C-alpha cells in the first residue's frame, strides 16, 4: 500500500484500506457489532454515551488503514493542535502568549465535539480530496468513506479515525 493524500480512482480507496469492495460492504453491514459496546456515564445534565469499539471487527483495521494511508497524509492547518503527535495541551497557547505578552486565556469546551461534525460537512471536505471526474464513481467513493468513518451519521469518539478526521 502506498501513502496518498488524494483519491483519484475507486481502486485507490481499496488499496489504502487493504480490502476489496465485497469485504468493505460486509464490514459496513457489521457496524452494529463494531460499535456494540455503548457505555452510558451519568453526568450533571443527563448522560455521556461512549462507544467501546470491537477491535476484532474488520472495520477497525479498515479505519486504521484509512488513517495511515490516506487521511493522515492530508496537510492540516497550522492552527490545529488537537491529537497531533508531539503537541501538548499548551502548545496552541504559545503564539497567543508570545503575541499578547500575558498568560491569561479562556478555555472553552465544545459539547459533543466529535458528534458536532456533521455528515454534510464531512462529505464536503472529503469531496475535495476525492479527485474523480466521473460523478457516479466520485459519489460512490465519498459514500464509502462516510460509511467507514461515521456511525448513525456521527463521528464517534474512541475510534482510531476520529482524531484525524476532527482535524481536517
Show the residue positions of the predicted features.
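Extracytoplasmic glycan-interaction modules
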Residues: 10-13, 47-51, 57-58, 133-137
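Conserved polymerase palm-domain catalytic core
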Residues: 27, 98-168
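Active-site-proximal segment of RNA-dependent polymerases
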Residues: 58-107, 163-167
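Short, conserved non-catalytic motifs in the polymerase core
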Residues: 39-63, 147-167
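N-terminal low-complexity, intrinsically disordered segments
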Residues: 16, 20-21, 69-70, 74-77, ...
